[in-house]
Design a protein with these regions (language model features):
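ATP/Mg2+-dependent ligation/transfer catalytic cores
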Residues: 1-155
Length: 155
């Protein structure tokens, strides 16, 4: 079994460390992180992601963090929202939550000896540049409705 120095590994990037300078510095200190993945969860609970090599992400980080990436929506389950003829879906990163690293312990990075990692960024799905869709929106709305209903009951 391969053993790794767990103290040298990156596990999360907290929400308060998402400036471009901080991200660049953190990823620069962790060359074992080879990919950045913007991950959205559809209403069926399936994750849809776009995996970007770190070098490409760093070159155009502002664009990726602001506008995300576009997918054709073919693998996204959005019943009664997206159809094959209008399935354009943008995956927009959420800078208000912690990001985490998914390590592949089967593939050590030859330079660091640490497992190759993918920075996974929770993201929203936006259909046709108009509305946020997917499980993150359902959860957000459920929390808001619960709070509103509870406050109404307490009044």
């Amino acid at each position: 079994m391969i053993s790794y120095d767990l103290d040298k590994m990156l596990y999360t990037i907290p929400a308060d460390k998402h400036s471009t300078e901080e991200i660049r510095e953190i990823l620069g200190k962790h060359p074992e992180i080879k990919f950045v993945s913007l991950v959205g969860i559809d209403v069926g609970g399936h994750d849809t992601d776009e995996k970007i090599p770190v070098e490409e992400f760093l070159k155009d980080m502002d664009k990726f963090l602001t506008h995300g990436v576009q997918t054709d929506g073919s693998s996204v389950v959005l019943p009664k929202i997206a159809k094959l003829n209008n399935a354009k879906v943008d995956i927009i990163p959420d800078k208000t939550v912690n990001w985490f690293v998914d390590h592949n312990f089967n593939y050590p990075d030859p330079d660091t000896g640490l497992p190759v990692g993918t920075l996974r960024i929770p993201s929203s799905l936006v259909h046709n540049d108009s509305e946020r869709v997917g499980s993150r929106v359902i959860l957000r709305d459920a929390i808001r409705n619960f709070k509103d209903d509870l406050m109404e009951l307490l009044r």
